[in-house]
Every structure is written in C-alpha cells, then in structure tokens.
C-alpha cells in the first residue's frame, strides 16, 4: 500500500542533497567506484508531499561482480543520532548511490533500509556522476514485490516522480552559483564577499521596485490597461510586508548587518583553523 502511495505521489528533492552527494563523490577513496549514503526527509503538511531534505555518507566496501557489500552500521547509527539532535523531524526514508544503473547490492541495501524506515519501503536515489551529455542524471526508485503467488518472489525497482525544490535561501545561493558559472572570465572558485552580494541584491531589488512603480503610475494615468492578475499579485506582495517606520527599519537592518559580520568573522576563523589542521595532518612524520 505504501509503494502504491509513493508511485502516485510527488517527491521533492532539496539541492543540498545533490551538493552533498557530489562533494562525497569528489572526496571518495581512490579504491571506491561509488559512494552510498542515507537519505533523510520529512512530510510537508502544507503541500502533502515528501521532501528529501538531507543525507549523510556511509562507510562501505564493495566487492566487484558480487551483490555483497559491507557497511559500517555503527557509523550509520551514530550519524543518524547526531542528526536527530539538530533536526529531529528528519527521518530515514531510503538511501542514495552513484552510478549509471541500479547496482547488484541494491537488494541487500533495500533489506537494511526497510528495517530502518518507518513505513518499511525505502526509496533509492541514483545519481549518474559520469555527466553523460553534460548533464548529471538523477533517478528515484521504489522497490515493488513481484512474483507468482506461493512461488518465487523478487524486487523490481520502479521509477518515482521527483522534482527539485528550493526555498528562498537556497534560491539565492543557486542564482549566485549560476551567475558565477556564466562568467568565464571570472576567477574559478572565487566568491565575492558577502557585503558585495548584499549590495548587488539591494541594487536588483531597487530595479524591480522602480519597475513596479512605473507600472502603477502608468496604470493610474491610464497609459496601460489594468491587469487583475498583476494587481492581486502586487497586493499580496505588499500586504505580506509589515508596515514599519524608517527608524525601525534602519535599526533592524543594522542589526542584521552586525549579525552577518559576526557570521563572516566566525566562518573565516573556522576556515583558517581547517587549513592549519590540514597542513599539520599532511606534514610527514619526523
């Protein structure tokens, strides 16, 4: 029954999950041909859809030409318990793997995650990192029991509908990454300071506000035909913003800037500490 529900429902995938999988694949050991990990998610009560919102990588060992796979279960349990301390609403909903097709070890992994999932029917996210056709293909499966009654039975992995979903913070980050990728003359990997990004976003917001004011003035002057859809959208946008005076807005803006500067300082300190730690670890033994 759960499998039938998933086959008909829409699954939403957060960009953070893909970025985590790509990072894990780039950092994999040299003797590993793929990476696998646990998918975490939650049910969205507003939309009624299931969201894949997080994941973590598993330590494992593959055996070529065999369906055997060894997984560090203690590490998996520890990672899940640590994640529950911060995000208790995220539960295990399946696993992910990199590759062009479903591996021979998928059945064994399905049996393990069937015990870990609340509904007993985990999902399998397959990411093709070979970039065939300059695209990273992703497919989501659910296992359906097939076979003859009172006879031999097996599993068939059926495709599930999956869509990318992102909120406002994720959209800002994705737009920035896309903007940097479309500028080949820019230094690769270089990200502008946060304050410069705030200035750019503020400038874009001012441009959009000027466009809205021009539309409203032209409509009031009867130079443009009124559009009820646009009017309702503007009304919803304006009523969603609380009405505050200039002094209160200035104080809130300054407080947010101070918080951002503190975050930048802490992030810089952590980055410097990580670089020092990597340098110390890479030093040869004396």
UniProtKB/Swiss-Prot annotation:
Keyword RNA-binding listed: no
GO molecular function term, any single one: metallopeptidase activity
UniProt GO cellular component terms: eukaryotic 43S preinitiation complex; eukaryotic 48S preinitiation complex; eukaryotic translation initiation factor 3 complex, eIF3m
Places the protein is found: Cytoplasm
PROSITE patterns listed in its UniProt record: MPN
Protein keywords: Cytoplasm, Initiation factor, Protein biosynthesis
Annotated SMART domains: JAB_MPN
A GO BP annotation: formation of cytoplasmic translation initiation complex
Keyword Hydrolase: no
Tree of life domain: Eukaryota
Domain MPN stretches: 11-147
Gene3D superfamilies membership: Cytidine Deaminase, domain 2
Family designation: Belongs to the eIF-3 subunit F family.
PANTHER family the record matches: EUKARYOTIC TRANSLATION INITIATION FACTOR 3 SUBUNIT F, EUKARYOTIC TRANSLATION INITIATION FACTOR 3 SUBUNIT F-RELATED
Function text: Component of the eukaryotic translation initiation factor 3 (eIF-3) complex, which is involved in protein synthesis of a specialized repertoire of mRNAs and, together with other initiation factors, stimulates binding of mRNA and methionyl-tRNAi to the 40S ribosome. The eIF-3 complex specifically targets and initiates translation of a subset of mRNAs involved in cell proliferation.
Record's subunit section: Component of the eukaryotic translation initiation factor 3 (eIF-3) complex. The eIF-3 complex interacts with pix.
The name this protein goes by in its record: Eukaryotic translation initiation factor 3 subunit F-2
Organism ancestry: Eukaryota, Metazoa, Ecdysozoa, Arthropoda, Hexapoda
